[in-house]
Amino acid sequence: MTRDVRQLFGTDGVRGRANFEPMTVETSVLLGKAIAGVLLEKHAGKHRVVVGKDTRLSGYMFENALIAGLTSMGIETLMLGPIPTPGVAFITRAYRADAGIMISASHNPYRDNGIKIFSSDGFKIGQAVEERIEAMVASKDFGKLPDDHAVGKNKRVKDATGRYIEYAKATFPKGRTLKGLRIVLDCAHGATYRVAPSVFEELDAEVICYGCEPSGCNINAGCGALWPSTIQKAVIEHKADVGIALDGDGDRLIMVDEKGHIVDGDMLLSICASDLKRRQALSDNRVVATVMTNFGVLRYLESLGIQVTISPVGDRHVLQHMLENQAVLGGEQSGHMIFLDYNTTGDGIVSALQVLRIMIESESTLSDLTACIAKSPQALINVPVTKKVPLESLANVQGVLKEVKEVLGDSGRILLRYSGTENICRVMVEGTKKHQVDSLAKTIVDVVEAEIGAEISE
């Protein structure tokens, strides 16, 4: 079956329910061959691709399928095993590989899986390369197959996680430790379940672990960055200094202060931007945030003399705007933070280390660091939908948006958008009064659910 261009790739690689198109073994083999074909178009000869994955049960079959496609075209593959997405980006550069592949659906439930592709420089491939891969999959024209003696070899890399652990620790100031800090750590039963505890423990922190027992079917299930309530309770129970919640593939970070209050990506971005400016390490005094960033946070950054470039939601868009504006720091409310001085993609562990460093150097608690940031009341509700109908075509939805805008006036805003990776419509309302914001968001949600809402299935 032929596919239209852009039918495979979404906003963050290929993603979908395991064993349903496009996330099938058959399509994964074709993707492996197409990735190889694109590499061989650049130049003939030897090529090397690293392949990592998170802890989903379906990761095994997609790992084998992709490697089969790659090696059938003469590509050498290096299996990294379970490793965070930023670890794949790092190892791709460290091993001078021609590409890196991460098998993960990030924060999605275990039933989903996905494929993210990195170029040799550790950045995610661009749209032009994605479209070339799609075209090859559709035509099944991957170029000449190698002779039987020239098929690729597959090797397992035993020290990949160890190298990533050392890299992450090296982003923390030499000679400093986390001694005296008690940390509650939630790894979402995901790709960081081995490396994150090791990083913080080897820096002498006392670590209390949650979400570190993956079964293949429990990744992101009531834990991790999407469910910080787990560590909110644990921080209070264990009298910890801080809580750290990562998502399934380790590129997101949400923290909890010593009082049990959630510190989201907006707040963490503000803390890190302020620190970089103080140290005169913030290029052009600029950070990149997104359309979802809280207005109170934007006002705080501007009060510090920090310029804010606004991008669409998604770490790919954040990175693009960072590169265009030569910014070294960017992030979004969901917890993606990119420190270009350290890595080419979001890295939850490295981001956490930077916040912990700031706490130690300033002799402050996390609540001290957030005390001066006054967030605007905001409601964000995810609505499961049956399909992503253009929102502008839904008369009732447009009608309620108009009504809510009239109520808010100039003192608030509404953002209604589909998720790029799930069948979800995100409803965000921001204003000056919490009860009003919550009520107006619920009003919009009710109409969206009536028009295109879906039953939640497990």
From Swiss-Prot:
**Which named protein is this?**
Phosphoglucosamine mutase
Specify one Pfam family.
PGM_PMM_I
Q: How is the cofactor bound?
A: Binds 1 Mg(2+) ion per subunit.
Top EC group: isomerase
Molecular functions (GO terms): magnesium ion binding; phosphoglucosamine mutase activity; phosphomannomutase activity
Q: Which UniProt keywords apply?
A: Isomerase, Magnesium, Metal-binding, Phosphoprotein
Q: What biological function has been recorded for the protein in this entry? A: Catalyzes the conversion of glucosamine-6-phosphate to glucosamine-1-phosphate.
In terms of InterPro entries, this protein maps to:
A-D-PHexomutase_a/b/a-I, A-D-PHexomutase_a/b/a-I/II/III, A-D-PHexomutase_a/b/a-II, A-D-PHexomutase_a/b/a-III, A-D-PHexomutase_C, A-D-PHexomutase_C_sf, A-D-PHexomutase_CS, Alpha-D-phosphohexomutase_SF
Give the highest taxon in the source lineage: Bacteria
Q: GO terms for CC?
A: cytosol
Q: Which residues form the active site?
A: S106
Point out the gene that encodes the protein.
glmM
Residues that bind Mg(2+): S106, D247, D249, D251
